[in-house]
A protein has these predicted regions:
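Residues forming the flavin
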Residues: 2-57, 61, 96-441
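Dinucleotide-binding Rossmann-like beta1-alpha1 core, especially the glycine-rich loop
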Residues: 41-91
């Protein structure tokens, strides 16, 4: 069959939740396209869930208020907690320890956010995706299928696709684009060809910090993924911690022409380390405002400097202004053996690839964090680069996430509508309700 009601790009949380809610609203003949052989984007990486309207969504971007956001989060939560392997890891009700950490952070002019959090782990990612897919009865998946172009033909849209070197066309009344972070650059270009308006928003650029788990247990035993938000004194820029993984691993994200650093945690097997991202929000104006290309330039530079791999540097070396090297990387004399790397990155100097302003901001924030949680700056602590979050392409939409082209809706991280699994799922629900109400009453 090549005729559908809704054509969905991307099988991540935004795409899947759009399909689930469309079916609940009585819409059938749904198709999901993904160039990967297995769905489903961010759902396969770690499975960390933050249920707090201050994390993962922008109320103004989604044109909803706090109450609407909380209601949507409850709807998303009900889907996740029915999965048996998804467990709550941060309890916020009447938690005096959270209040104590908030007070300590406040003494250093740092904002501290402790959301209700659940986790199912990378090792359970495919099981969770299968659990979601099992609820879909009127949705067809086209995996390993690349969408080459989108065309408007009369009152319907045409996807020109390629699979196994063969081309085929699929038609639909409406389109939901949720390309994910890895597909953001591609969809930005392909959408412009059919007249969809988009612009550049801020991008997050930084590092992943890995340290001996004991140095961070005091906070992660209370809040699994603590959120610290800094505003630097020197430049007045925003830096935040993100995606903390107690007992986790450092991993990579593969893109077409570079690799980015990331981190995750398994449900059943833990390491002796903890890792978290420390990222600087960057906005650009004239004459160069393309934050996507800015991030890609940094990523490609690290790809060259690291010989095809991300770069890692010990804080002990960083403080002395020298690069890390293989010969001394695990030196007992320098106390580097306290934290063994969980990913084989290239030892080097992260300051060669990051702009000086970003390095200044990250270092200032690390020093402040060490005052809140002493032990962060142990010489053995590892700094991996680059960690870049491509949430930066923004699409102008109405409150149902429909673009300026009738029938084309967007959702998820890759279109600037969310930052993380829960936010992506929420944007998918909003889009599904908009599609059903306008086109399938």
């Amino acid at each position: 069959m090549s005729e559908f009601n809704v054509l969905i790009i991307g099988s991540g949380p935004a795409g899947l939740f759009t399909a689930i809610w469309l079916e609940r609203l009585g819409v059938d003949k749904i198709a999901i396209f993904d160039r990967k052989q297995y769905s489903a984007g961010g759902l396969l990486n770690d499975g960390k869930l933050n249920f707090d309207y201050r994390v993962g969504i922008d109320l103004d971007e989604l044109q909803i208020d706090k109450k609407e956001a909380q209601n949507l989060m409850q709807e998303v939560k009900q889907v996740f907690i029915k999965f048996p392997l998804c467990q709550q890891v941060t309890f916020i009700e009447n938690n005096e320890k959270i209040d104590a950490w908030r007070k300590i952070a406040g003494e250093h002019n740092v904002e501290f956010i402790a959301p209700e959090q659940w986790h199912y782990g990378t090792d359970n990612g495919k099981k969770f995706v299968d659990y979601l897919r099992s609820s879909l009865v009127n949705t067809t998946f086209f995996l390993g299928t690349e969408v080459i172009s989108i065309e408007k033909q009369d009152e319907r849209f045409c996807f020109v696709c390629r699979k196994d070197q063969k081309r085929k066309e699929y038609f639909g009344k409406t389109v939901l684009a949720s390309p994910g972070r890895s597909g953001a650059y591609w969809f930005r270009d392909i959408s412009r060809k059919i007249g969809v308006n988009n612009n550049f928003g801020p991008i997050d650029v930084g590092i992943r910090v890995e340290l001996n788990r004991k140095s961070y247990d005091s906070i992660t035993d209370v809040v699994y993924d603590p959120k610290f938000i800094f505003h630097t004194k020197r430049h007045g820029d925003r830096v935040r911690t993100f995606c903390t993984n107690p007992g986790g691993r450092v991993r990579i994200e593969n893109y077409d022409s570079f690799k980015l650093i990331n981190g995750d945690a398994l449900f059943d097997r833990k390491t002796e380390n903890t890792n978290f991202a420390l990222i600087n929000t960057v906005s650009l104006t004239q004459p160069f405002s393309d934050t996507t290309e800015f991030g890609r330039m940094i990523a490609r530079q690290f790809f060259l400097l690291g010989g095809g791999r991300p770069i890692v540097q010990r804080i002990g070396d960083f403080r002395e202004g020298k690069r890390s090297s293989k010969s001394t990387f695990n030196s007992k004399t320098s106390h580097f053996d306290r934290c063994r790397a969980t990913y084989n990155a290239t030892p080097g100097d992260i300051t060669l690839g990051l702009p000086a302003r970003i390095v200044d901001n990250l270092w200032e924030s690390l020093k402040t964090l060490d005052k809140i949680v002493p032990g962060i700056l142990h010489p053995s602590t590892l700094l991996y680069a680059p960690e870049i979050k491509f949430f930066d392409t923004h699409f102008s939409t109405d409150r149902h996430l429909e673009t300026n082209i009738d029938g084309i809706f967007v959702a998820g991280d890759g279109t600037g509508k969310s930052r993380g699994i829960v936010g992506a799922a929420i944007s998918g629900i909003i889009a599904a309700r908009g599609i059903a109400a306008k086109y399938f009453k």
